[in-house]
Amino acid sequence: MLLLKHGTIEILDQKTMYGWYELPKQEFLNGEQPEPITHYIKQFPLMK
């Protein structure tokens, strides 16, 4: 689930709602970003 909050994007685990991280909004919306958003999720696993 993606939530917009205070200019950042929080990614929450839909099953547990534990853990979240923020990416700069501009970086997330930038169509030229080299890696898809799933890359960030895989690289930084949610805290359980």
UniProtKB/Swiss-Prot annotation:
The UniProt entry's GO CC annotations, sorted and at most eight, read:
chloroplast
The listed locations are: Plastid, Chloroplast
What are the UniProt keywords, alphabetically? Chloroplast, Plastid
Give the protein family: Belongs to the ycf15 family.
Protein name listed in UniProt:
Putative uncharacterized protein ycf15
Species of origin: Amborella trichopoda
